Amino acid sequence: MDRKSFLKTLGMAGVAAVAAPVLMFCRKDDEDEDAVTGIINNSISTACAVTNSETEGPFPTKSPSGLVQTNIVSDRTGVPFTIAITVQNVNANCANLQGAIVDIWHCDKDGNYSEYGGTGMQSTNYASAHFLRGRQTTDANGKVNFTSIFPGWYNGRATHIHVHVYNAAGQSLLVTQIAFPEGNDSAVALVAASTGYKGLSGYTYNSNDNVFSDGTSNEMSAVTGTVSGGFALTHTIKVSV
């Protein structure tokens, strides 16, 4: 099974289950991936409501407790990238949540994940590597920070970051994903055109993405910076504690 088949199968399973919104998808990922077919919407919701739950995908971190680190670059190369995530509690009027455990993971510039590979899902074998994965605990301001490289993309998905949030006791609060702004002057477009990245030919935009096609307003990040100086992502995730 390849990644596109996995996402499609997972989406159907979520619709059938209904009770598992984390698996619900409503668009096929074999739609036109060469152009944006809908209007680009990079708006960010400010509502005090739980962030959408999403699938953890086929490449979740296997032992996140062993990857407590802020610098997740390892041996990967790419445009410098920092990730700042704030976690808020909707049951406390969206006050910043201290002590939440945050796991993140994303693909490298070529669209590959560590800890997996050698299969139809991902041909390149990185089963023994752990790059671009990390865990941090939110501070008094509800924040965690990571140093990484700007992620690439792979067939069937827009650029994204996976996030799993737990309470201080290690109980799961939310599995979600972070979306990236799109457009000609977006970081996604600028990085894709830079040295070492693969461009946007065949790219799946948010409007056609299996996960994001139902809307990205509470999953959309803000990304600033330049290719030469690096980019910085900020994002707020809202959970129920």
Residues covered by each model-derived region:
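N-terminal secretory signal peptides and thylakoid transit peptides that target proteins
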Residues: 1-14, 29-30
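C-terminal region/CTD detector
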Residues: 8-11, 15, 227-233
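C-terminal motif of bacterial Sec signal peptides marking the signal peptidase cleavage site
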Residues: 24-25
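Beta-strand-dominated extracellular/periplasmic modules and repeats
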Residues: 35-215, 234, 238-241
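Exposed beta-sheet edge/beta-hairpin loop segments within beta-rich domains
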Residues: 151-154, 222-228
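Low-complexity, intrinsically disordered Gly/Pro/Thr-rich segments
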Residues: 212-225
